[in-house]
Regions:
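Glycine-aromatic micro-motifs
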Residues: 2-125
Length: 125
């Protein structure tokens, strides 16, 4: 099998992980690289009426998901995996790439990284 290795140095955050204070607590060595949008995806809440709902993404032609790109260390990825409940199978890591623009002039470029996507077949807690 010839699977492409996922770049786990760049994390694309959406939803609550766009909160910089929250990210700083969860991933103290993460550095904000810039912002962008992932084209042809949309945000989707999944959950139960009486309980929590969880944010995920899914393909949707013409839609866009706003993201922040962070440079992360293995320890940050470990904390994110726990927060996103990867060990139980709620979310999985998927590769993604998009153009990211930072705060400096001419500081835009396409970065390959990863984000978390909810598994469709997973029962919600």
């Amino acid at each position: 099998m010839n699977e492409k290795k996922i770049n786990q140095d760049i994390y694309y955050a959406y939803g609550s992980n766009l909160n910089l204070r929250q990210m700083a607590r969860r991933c103290p060595t993460a550095e904000l690289l810039g912002t962008g949008v992932i084209p042809d995806y949309e945000l989707l809440f999944r959950g139960r009426e009486e309980g929590k709902s969880y944010l995920t993404v899914r393909p949707c032609p013409g839609a866009q998901v706003p993201v922040a790109a962070f440079s992360v260390q293995p320890s940050d990825v470990h904390e994110l995996d726990l927060y996103e409940d990867v060990p139980s199978g709620l979310y999985r890591i998927e590769p993604i790439a998009t153009e990211v623009c930072g705060s400096g002039r001419n500081s835009c470029g396409v970065l390959e990284g990863f984000w978390y996507v909810m598994n469709d077949d997973r029962r919600l807690p």
